[in-house]
Amino acid sequence: MFDRKTIAAFIIFAVMTMGGCGSSSSNFLSENDRMIQAMTLEEKVGQLFIIRPEHLNRTVSADYIHYHLTSWDTVLTDEMKDTLSKYPVGGFALFARNLDTHEQVKQFTADLGAACEIPPFMALDEEGGRVRRIGRKFSADVEQIGTMQSIGDTGDPQNAYNAAYTIGGYVKEYGFNLDFAPVADVNTNPDNIVIGDRAFGSDPELVSSMVSAYIDGLHAQGVMATLKHFPGHGDTTNDTHTGYSAVYKTWDEILQVELIPFVDNFDKTEMVMTAHITMPNVTSDDLPATLSHEIMTGKLRDELGYNGVLITDSMEMGAIIQNYPHTEVVIMAIEAGNDIVLLPYDYVASFNAVVDAVK
C-alpha cells in the first residue's frame, strides 16, 4: 500500500525539481528504491497524507480546528516541529488564512519544507476565478485570472495556457510546487452550485483541450498539476462540502462526457483528485466515489488504466465527516485505492490508525 504511492511521489517530485540533473531513469529508480527501503514505517505512513499546518498544533483539538478556529497558523513553531518529528507528512495544503504577507508566506513554506526529512508537496487551490488563495489575498500584487468558464468561452486553449503560466509563476515564487488544478469537470448541470464557472464549459472536447493547455502552463513554471474531481462533479446539484451529493448517470453515459477530459490527460497530470459524489447507477455499495473500491480501483485503475497518483478531495468535507468515523474513513479511502489522503479530520489519530492497521 505504501510502495506505489511513495515511488510515484518521489518520481513526480524529481521530474519537476531535478529534471536538469542528467541522471538516467534506471539510476534514479535504483536510488529511489534505496530511499524507500531506508524509510521507517512511520515515514512511509506519513507520505500518505497532505495536511493543513494547524494539524501540527496539538494545543487544540481536531473539533476546535474544524469548528471554532479563528487564528490560523502563519509561522512554524518549535511545538509544531516536534509534532512533525513524531508524525511526518507527505505535504501541506495552505489556505488564504495561512497567508499574511509576501515574505511571511515564503518563509512559512520554506520552514515547513526544511522541517521535513523527505521533501514535501507544498500545495494550494489556485485555479483562477473564484478559487484563488494567493490571488484573493494579494489581489493588488498578482495578476487576476478570470473564471475558467470565461476562458473556455474564448475557444482558444492558448488562453488556458497563459492563465496557468501566470498562476504557476506566482505560486512557485511563494514556495508552492503543487496546484490542485485544473478543474476537469464538464459543467453539464446549470443548477450546479459547486462547480459552475470553475469548469471550462459543457463541451467535453473543449474542456479536454483547455485542461491540457492549462497543465502545460503549470509545467512550464515547474509546478505540478492535479486533475479534479474524478469521476466528474459537473452534473451535481448539491455541494459535497456540506453534505451528500449524487450523480445518477450510468457508467456508459459518464464515459461519453464527464470522463473525456480526465482520460485524455492522464498521461500529463501528476495527480488525479477524487470526488465525494455517490453514483448509485454505477456502484453497488452507494459509497462516495472517494471510498469506493469499485470506482477508484475497478474503474479508474483497472478499466481506464490510470497508474499515477490518486489523491482524495478534502476529508474534512461534509459528505465525509457527517457520515463516517474520522479515522475509519481514512482506512477506507486507502483501501479503495487512494494514494494520498488530503486533510484528514484528525491527523495524529488518522496517522496512528494507519500504523496500527499495518502492524
Task: Say what each PLM segment does.
Residues 22-24:
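Bacterial signal peptide processing site
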Residues 3-11:
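Sec-dependent signal peptide recognition
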Residues 78-95, 165-178:
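Catalytic domains of carbohydrate-active enzymes, especially glycoside hydrolases
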Residues 17-20:
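C-terminal motif of bacterial Sec signal peptides marking the signal peptidase cleavage site
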Residues 35-40, 64-79, 98-120, 130-132, ...:
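Second-shell residues forming the walls of enzyme active-site clefts
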Residues 146-176, 181-215, 219:
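A substrate-binding/cap region within the structured catalytic cores of diverse enzymes
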Residues 54-55, 124-132, 136-137, 177-187, ...:
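Short glycine-enriched loops at secondary-structure junctions
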Residues 31-58, 81, 85:
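Mature N-terminal segment immediately following signal peptide/propeptide cleavage
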